[in-house]
From Swiss-Prot:
Keywords: ATP synthesis, CF(0), Chloroplast, Hydrogen ion transport, Ion transport, Lipid-binding, Membrane, Plastid, Thylakoid, Transmembrane, Transmembrane helix, Transport. Its main location: plastid. This is ATP synthase subunit c, chloroplastic. GO terms for molecular function: lipid binding; proton-transporting ATP synthase activity, rotational mechanism. It comes from the Eukaryota. The gene is atpH. It is a multi-pass membrane protein. It is found in: Plastid, Chloroplast thylakoid membrane.
């Protein structure tokens, strides 16, 4: 096993998880803030806002999980190591 390839794989795995968490983290914070603002303006639309918020948060969180899958495949099932 080449040490340069394994070191690059560890760095890439760390970057994959870190970068995959930044975008959804910012998006989830923004979505939650806008949902709270919408609830403050129209409390009667709580059910519709909550359902849409939970669905969008699940989609955003799936991006982070995909980054984790890429990182785990680089660490444990690396296609670049023969």
């Amino acid at each position: 096993m080449d040490p340069i390839i394994s070191a690059a794989s560890v760095i890439a795995a760390g970057l994959a998880v870190g970068l995959a968490a930044i975008g959804p983290g910012i998006g989830q914070g923004s979505a939650a803030a806008n949902a709270v603002e919408g609830l403050a303006r129209q409390p009667e639309a709580e059910g519709k806002i909550r359902g849409t918020l939970l669905l969008s948060l699940a989609f955003m969180e799936s991006l982070t999980i995909y980054g984790l899958v890429v990182a785990l495949s680089l660490l444990f099932a690396n296609p670049f190591i023969k």
